[in-house]
Amino acid sequence: MALFKVILTAFAALSAVDAARLLSSPNDKDVVPNSYLVVMKDSVTSAEFDSHVTWATDLHGESVSRRGADGLNGFKYSYKINGWHAYSGSFHQETLDEILNNDKVDFVEHDRYVYISGFVTQKDAPSWGLGRVSHRHNGTRDYVYDERAGKGITFYGVDTGIDIHHPDFGGRAVWGTNVVNGTKDNDRQGHGTHTAATATGTKYGLAKNANVVAVKALNDYGAGLWSNIMKALEWCVEDATKKNIIGKAVLNLSISGGKVVAANQAVTKTAKAGIFVSVAAGNDNQDATNKSPASAEGVCCAAATTIRDDKAKFSNYGSVVKIYAPGQGITSATPNNSTGVMSGTSMAAPHVGGVGATLMASKGIAPADLCAELIKVASGPVQNPGSSTTNKLLYNGSGQ
């Protein structure tokens, strides 16, 4: 009997060691209670993943049968991005414990909200970002750029939607997908149209000939769940693969929130699939190392500057920032044939995406090498960039 107890104790200890980790703190204000992101081990095959999802779905159903309906819907989305497997859902603690003890699971994290990284400032302010990124020295409004201007490159705006009929897109914009339940295929907030036009607009944008795809992953108030955004990323990779434009695509994420490991992995896998990913550093005037997607590997993280080449007071900073770009008082398109002025690292990121698209078109630079090229040709220095932060300022290599 004593030996049996020892064996049981050892087995329990081994099970505890092998159990997956639950990473997030449930006390965070942005965390969604009882909603989880479940990430599988790298060794799990697609078939094993499908089988596991079926198991988890059945497990939740059994829990509901025992406990009755409790408002938890169980399985939500599965994700397959460049060999990476994960899923999301809302589960009772009993079901969560079973998932954590499954040997195919690497870790589990709470689903949480993420937010746009821009805000409206003033109306009728002059636009200056185009001229700034096409000259090494400040002081001119002329925009000098390669005539191809992103031709043959596709820009995915993962945001609040895009007004694809806005004249600034010149008929180059199409609707892609909407992963936000209960919202229409439009941009009521305006943030997504503004960022997309900053990158690709005929008048206000950098890559004036790029194709534009609207991907709605944030609600009409500028907030979104990572479980939805990850589904949008999966869709973009699948769409780019289907259209044979891997290596000729840019994806912009002008969002910021607390660090989420599962989200970072999804973003990194998107980049490694062959899509250049520009992201916002965030607007908290703090180190972006603890922010997602800013801290994801393989992305080009942009912080924001003022018209005087200073770090914008709101901009995050830190070692994960790859480059600075114009982000304060940026004029661009907004829904219903309008224009507006916004500030934020949300505006800096599409400057990076737009210049990235122009260089991909003109020089054929691979997405994986593009951020390094932007850093190599960058101008500067940015004044007071922040602790452990680059002072490089985005430049399109025009020779001016």
Curated annotation (Swiss-Prot):
Entry similarity comment: Belongs to the peptidase S8 family.
The protein's name in its UniProt record: Subtilisin-like protease 11
GO cellular component terms given for this protein: extracellular region
Entry EC no(s): 3.4.21.-
Main location: secreted
Region described as Disordered: spans on this chain: 381-400
Biased composition (Polar residues): 381-393
Domain Inhibitor I9 residue range list: 35-116
Signal peptide (residue range): 1-19
Protein location: Secreted
Source species of the chain: Arthroderma otae (strain ATCC MYA-4605 / CBS 113480) (Microsporum canis)
Assigned keywords, A-Z: Glycoprotein, Hydrolase, Protease, Secreted, Serine protease, Signal, Virulence, Zymogen
EC class name: hydrolase
Described purpose of this protein according to its UniProt entry: Secreted subtilisin-like serine protease with keratinolytic activity that contributes to pathogenicity.
Residues the record marks as carrying a glycan: 138, 181, 252, 336-337, 396
Prodomain residues: 20-117
Any one GO BP annotation for this protein: proteolysis
Residues the record marks as active site: 159, 191, 346
